[in-house]
């Protein structure tokens, strides 16, 4: 809740060329000032940040991705314009959610998602054994630790989870996520217990992926990974050309 993220450098990547004739402008909602129609992003921010939205008859669910991976894939596409999905997936192997939880979707399924623009990503909590107990040290994206404890406690009260004797939330500043599940005895199969909890609580979640965006042609459509990157490369080439033309015009005015 109180984590501070310093995004100044990243914001510069999105805004640095704004005053250099790179994009078109339009009036804002009340006509009091003009605002850019798009930002002259120097990186494919749509893939990096991810987004979600819904409209009549369509929806968009794009997960976030790793900055280095996306940039490397884009450079590969520039060097090899005919690169296929498999070649791009050497660099972008899966989405990159802001958590240490594990993505359990197979690499083959992930490639199919990037190829078709549709699918789902499965993610489960990361845990380890400690003094005979289970310690959860990372939860799936947007999963609340208190809600997970409530779900487990409800099963204990309903006598559907006889293997567990105690729950503790030991999360603190040093360990943002540390949920302890104490088994009833040392004879409890922890792997079997966790398999049950993965199936019945939010310790395992599925995230829908739908790469439905408005393309360079101004029309919405589901796009594959390579189509998204190619659209951005096309946009970036237009942006760079407009920037150079703007600078040339300024120089000619001074001569």
Which stretches of residues belong to each language-model region?
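P-loop NTPase nucleotide-binding/switch module
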Residues: 14-42
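C-terminal interaction appendages of subunits in large macromolecular complexes
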Residues: 2-5, 9-13, 18-21, 25, ...
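Long insertion/accessory domains within large nucleic-acid-processing enzymes
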Residues: 32-48, 53-56, 61
